[in-house]
């Protein structure tokens, strides 16, 4: 009986997150803890480029940045406690929310806020008739 050889399904490689940015990142800052935490697993090991999707050039830069951050005691050599990782993620979300609010405030003129308040009809209660 003939053996059936099955092909592995083609899985598209994730694009490098550093190459996708408008200005390609040439230096990955070791002081940027929030970004480096995403590239390290719970045991503190550097995630492979196959998992993170980084290209070879940026993977080498990521490894160097993580090693520098460990040496400078920004990242621990062993894994982060889940509580610490959650706090870092929350801090990062707060920063992103502040950036979004600032961009909305700068884009939105003050007059439009007043105009939207005037255009809304005021709600009144109807008197009950018995």
Curated annotation (Swiss-Prot):
Disulphide linkage map: none
Cite the record's Basic and acidic residues compositional bias ranges: 98-108, 117-130
Question: What segment(s) does the record annotate as region Disordered?
Answer: 98-130
| InterPro entries attached to this UniProt entry | Ribosomal_bS18, Ribosomal_bS18_sf
- What Pfam families does UniProt report for this protein, alphabetically? Ribosomal_S18
Q: Which domain of life is it from?
A: Bacteria
GO function term, MF aspect, one: small ribosomal subunit rRNA binding
User: Signal peptide span per the entry?
Assistant: none
Role, per record: Binds as a heterodimer with protein bS6 to the central domain of the 16S rRNA, where it helps stabilize the platform of the 30S subunit.
Q: Which family does it belong to?
A: Belongs to the bacterial ribosomal protein bS18 family.
- Subunit and interaction comment: Part of the 30S ribosomal subunit. Forms a tight heterodimer with protein bS6.
Q: What HAMAP family does the database record attribute to this sequence?
A: Ribosomal_bS18
Protein name (record):
Small ribosomal subunit protein bS18
Organism encoding this protein: Metamycoplasma arthritidis (strain 158L3-1) (Mycoplasma arthritidis)
Provide the gene name from the record.
Answer: rpsR
